[in-house]
Amino acid sequence: MLNRIMISELAFPALLVGGALAFEQLMAPARVLFGQVSDRWKIGGLRRTPYIWLGTAGFCTLATLSIPVIFATSSALSSGSTTSITAWVMALCGLFALYGVAISSASTPYLALVIDLTDEQERPRVVGIIWCMLTVGIIVGAIAISISTRSLDDVTDPAVLQSTLQGFMNRVALVIGSIVLLATVGIEPKQAKGKADGESGRNKKDVTLKQSWALIRSSRQILIFFCFLLCFTLGLFLQDPILESYGAEVFGMEIRQSTMLNAFWGCGTLAGLLIAGLWFTPRFGKLSSARTGCWMILASLLLLIAAGLTGSIGTLLVVMVLFGLSAGIGTNSALSLMLDLTIPQLAGTFVGVWGLAQAMSRALGKVMGGGLLDLGRFLSNSDQPLQAFSFVFVIEAGVVLIAIALLNRLNTAQFRRDTETRMDILLMANLDD
C-alpha cells in the first residue's frame, strides 16, 4: 500500500521508492548476526523468544513512524529545497534500515525456533502451516486496508491521506504486537539458569562465528542454494513495488481496488501452500516441487502482460490467483529445502544465511523494480504504461529461468556429507584445545 501511495498519489520517483524500501533488506547481514547470537546466548533461560519480542517491539514502533516521515519527505520534494530533500530522504532510508534490523531480530530466531521444535519429517507440513497463516494475514491485511482506505478514493489532499493512514498504522502495530506476544509465550521450553548457562558456555566454546563461517563455506552446495534462493525470491518479488501502480495506471484501479490485488494473490498462495504441503511436495519431492513452482511463476509473469493487453480487471484478478498458487507451491518446497540444508547445532546461523539470501533479493527487487520501471518508461518513450511494466515482467521471467538452472545443480545429500565432515573436524579441534 505504501509504495502505491508514494508512487501514484504523492508522485515519488519509482526509483526513490524502491531504493528507500530496499534499505529494509540491505540490513540482511544482521540476520546472520542475530542467528549466531540466538545460538550462543540465552536471555532468562530462553534462546529464541526474547529476540523475537524485542524485534517485534522495534518494527511495530517504526511502522507507526513511517507515515509522518513519508509525508514529510513528500513536502520536502514539493519544496524543491536540496537541503530539505536530502535530509528527509536520508531519514526515510534510515527508518527503513532500522525496520530491517528489527525484522531480522524477530524473524531469524523465529525460524531457528521452528527447527529446534521439529524434525525433518515434520518440517514440510510445519512450513506449510506457517506460510498459510502468513498468507491469511496478507489476505486479512489487504481486506482491512481496502476497507480502511475506501474513503480515500479520489482524495488528493495529503493531510487527509496522512491522517487516515496514521490511524490505521497505529491500530495495525498494536494488533500485530499483541498477536506475536500471545503466539510465542510459553512455546519455547525454559531451562534452569545453571543448565542454560552451562550449555551456553559449551556452545560458545564449540563453534565460534569464525568457525561457523568456515563451515558455511565448506560446501559448494551452500553457494548453489544461496544463489537459487536469491534468484527465486527476486523472480517472485521483482514486481512487488510496482504491482499496485500497474493496477492503477494500466487498469485504472482506485486505491482500495489495487490493494485487493494482494488479497487475490494471497488466496492463490494459500491454496498453493496447502496443495504443496499436504500433497504435492510429499508425493513428488522437494526438488521437483520447487522446479514446478518456478515454471508456474514464469508462466504467471507472462500472463500478467497478457492481462494488461486485455485491460480487463477480472482477467488481472484471475492471473493474480494463479500467480499466488504458483508462489505457494514454489515457496513451500523452497523453504522445506532451506530447513533441510541446515544443521541443528547451528540452526540460527544457517537460517540467518538463508534469510540473508532472501533479504538481499528482496532489496534488489525493490530497487530494480522501481528502477526498471523508470528505465522502461524511458526506453518505450510512450504514453502507454503497459510497455514499461511489461519490460519489468520480462526481466523478472529471465531471473526465474536462472533459478531453475541453479536448482538443477542442487544436491542435498552432498550438502550433508560436506557439512557433517567439517562439523566433526571443528568439534574434534575444540576438544583438542
List PLM regions with ranges.
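C-terminal transmembrane helical hairpin of 12-TM major facilitator-type secondary transporters
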Residues: 290-334
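A late C-terminal transmembrane helix in Major Facilitator Superfamily
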Residues: 346-377
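Loop-to-transmembrane helix entry/capping segments in MFS-fold secondary transporters
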Residues: 14-15, 89-90, 120-129, 255-256, ...
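C-terminal ends and interior cores of transmembrane alpha-helices
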Residues: 53-85, 295-311
